[in-house]
Design a protein with these regions (language model features):
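N-terminal export/targeting leaders of redox proteins
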Residues: 1-52, 56-60, 64, 68, ...
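Primarily the internal scaffold of c-type cytochrome electron-transfer domains
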Residues: 2-6, 94-126, 171-222
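A short, flexible N-terminal coil/short beta segment enriched in small residues
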Residues: 18-22, 90-95, 99
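Axial heme c-ligation environment in periplasmic c-type cytochrome domains
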Residues: 58, 130-133, 151-155, 203-209
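The canonical Cys-X-X-Cys-His
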Residues: 63-72, 84-94, 140-146, 163-170, ...
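Short Cys/His-rich "knuckle" micro-motifs
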Residues: 76-80, 97-101, 150-154, 174-177
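Soluble extracytoplasmic domains of inner/organellar membrane proteins
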Residues: 124, 132-180
């Protein structure tokens, strides 16, 4: 029987198969990298605000405690955003006539809230409660990064599920003393054997739930 295909067809078929596999793997790699990139997660992206509030100045330079502005962080799901009255407690006397703060004064006069842009925007299907994390030994900087070094606030973590699960699977890696919850200089992760042992102690003292609860879908998706 005469040969229908040229003998080079075998090589062409192999090249096609290998090429398809390579392209498939490459596309999968690109998809994974895009999913983890700042383009998708918003990590490292500075958000321009109506008034460029500097955490570096207020927290880092002036030493203002997180709870002065985020008053409900220890008692509610939301940490809370400060009202304009909170801003004006200081700025009636400090920078009282600065053009830079005119939007703040206008908000104070009219009673219309400042339209802050959300920095950490969790999807609606994810439930997060600030108070339970704070009261179980998770510090602000563990999730939010060193805000005392941020002239403009940005999202320091991906906020993706694998990031959340890293802590829920091994909370002892990220716990700290309760008196250090709002301390920006405290370590964000326990790495050495001694630090991990401390983490295990805090985990027991704070009665942190086990993996069965922390990894349950309903814990974060309600």
């Amino acid at each position: 029987m005469p040969q229908i295909f040229h003998h080079s067809t075998n090589a062409l078929a192999k090249i096609t198969i290998y090429g398809a596999v390579f392209i498939g793997v490459a596309l999968l790699w690109v998809a994974v990298e895009l999913n983890r990139s700042s383009w998708n997660t918003g990590q490292w992206v500075e958000k321009q605000q109506p008034v460029q509030f500097s955490h570096k100045h207020h927290v880092g330079d002036d030493g203002i405690d997180c709870r002065y502005c985020h008053t409900s962080v220890e008692t509610a799901a939301s940490a809370g955003m400060p009202s304009t009255n909170t801003c004006m407690n200081c700025h009636k006397q400090i920078w009282a006539d600065s053009p830079y703060l005119e939007p703040v004064r206008a908000s104070f006069r009219t009673g219309k809230p400042i339209g802050w842009i959300r920095v950490h925007d969790l999807p609606d299907y994810a439930y997060f409660n600030h108070s339970i994390h704070v009261n179980k030994g998770v510090g602000c900087s563990t999730c939010h990064g060193r805000v005392d070094d941020m002239p403009i606030a940005y999202q320091a973590a991906t906020l993706q599920m694998e990031w959340c699960l890293a802590c829920h699977r091994q909370p002892e890696r990220f716990l700290r003393p309760k008196e250090k919850i709002f301390d920006m200089t405290w370590r964000t992760e326990n790495k050495s054997a001694e630090e991990l042992q401390e983490g295990m102690t805090w985990k027991a003292d704070y009665k942190v739930q086990g993996r069965a609860v922390l990894e349950s879908c309903s814990t974060c998706h309600r």
